[in-house]
Amino acid sequence: MKHLPAQDEQVFNAIKNERERQQTKIELIASENFVSEAVMEAQGSVLTNKYAEGYPGKRYYGGCEHVDVVEDIARDRAKEIFGAEHVNVQPHSGAQANMAVYFTILEQGDTVLGMNLSHGGHLTHGSPVNFSGVQYNFVEYGVDKETQYIDYDDVREKALAHKPKLIVAGASAYPRTIDFKKFREIADEVGAYFMVDMAHIAGLVAAGLHPNPVPYADFVTTTTHKTLRGPRGGMILCREEFGKKIDKSIFPGIQGGPLMHVIAAKAVSFGEVLQDDFKTYAQNVISNAKRLAEALTKEGIQLVSGGTDNHLILVDLRSLGLTGKVAEHVLDEIGITSNKNAIPYDPEKPFVTSGIRLGTAAVTSRGFDGDALEEVGAIIALALKNHEDEGKLEEARQRVAALTDKFPLYKELDY
């Protein structure tokens, strides 16, 4: 950085400290990733100066000829990646992408079927503290108490009983493959629209390593970060028949001007997804998650559903006598970043929880391999089993430091 250190030392120091934190800690938050330098350059470009209300060729401002090119590139690449008929890359977040779909097809008070938050769903899938649970009548489905897999019989029974206008699939903490075909069949049986929120698994879908929801769903929403490894933002994919309504729901419905610098970064990251090495990356994300799951299981640590099919693992801490709140703090103290997370049928409060969520997208971007993830699993077990033993915790810190030194992050950044 050339100008910021001299102009605003306080902000620069905060950025520099965050850069140091990312380098010296192991990032296992499942919703986080490390974007490329090219993505960061696009997001920090002069496009941040341009207002561009509307869509390419139909703007409310002049001087949009170059940002039109950028947005068209982003849309075309997303269509190619996922095989979608229509794409909107303007949502500022996944939550706003979901809101736009709801505003497109629902009226206040309409019934919607969505996944219970504590079973792995998302706030925008009907949580009573979120706009979705306030505006609409959400009925919850969940996972089987024994297998901890989605109970499709329960989904069907609730769909038949409540006749929802929309069924929502997708999750923020579900480690297993979702059967989109089964959901489509249930939606058709009750005459419901079908939406998939693939925010967590979009990169795996893009690589062909998880079933693609686009052929089955009326609407697919996603974030553009997480496993897709782009900038923080959202996107909607849908059938052409819904395209104009979706676009109107985003603008002028719930947003004003799009963030063109972020859309440029989305376009760059989509270009990266189309490269052959992205599939290798996504394969490594999954294999690393499986190695981490195996390492934790070997240490006697329980996992929700017994393992993972994707990038994330949900750890059940009850056998260790720990809460998620305590475990998150213990791991942070040794240099591993995670988040407390509810588990299915969790007896603890949402700010305490009985679990932690772990993900491998970020560490895989950093270069961690299967052996490294096996070591990470051993370190986690050492710390959690000995969370009051300062000697053991110091050993864990040293082992974390050895890994972060071995896999440096952003070697070319000058701060």
Curated annotation (Swiss-Prot):
- Its annotated pathway? One-carbon metabolism; tetrahydrofolate interconversion; Amino-acid biosynthesis; glycine biosynthesis; glycine from L-serine: step 1/1
Q: Which reactions does this protein catalyse?
A: (6R)-5,10-methylene-5,6,7,8-tetrahydrofolate + glycine + H2O = (6S)-5,6,7,8-tetrahydrofolate + L-serine
- Keyword Transport in the entry? The reply is no
PROSITE patterns recorded: SHMT
Job of this protein: Catalyzes the reversible interconversion of serine and glycine with tetrahydrofolate (THF) serving as the one-carbon carrier. This reaction serves as the major source of one-carbon groups required for the biosynthesis of purines, thymidylate, methionine, and other important biomolecules. Also exhibits THF-independent aldolase activity toward beta-hydroxyamino acids, producing glycine and aldehydes, via a retro-aldol mechanism.
**What NCBIfam families does the record point to?**
PRK00011.1 (NF000586)
Q: Output this protein's name.
A: Serine hydroxymethyltransferase
Source organism: Bacillus subtilis (strain 168)
Identify the gene encoding this protein. glyA
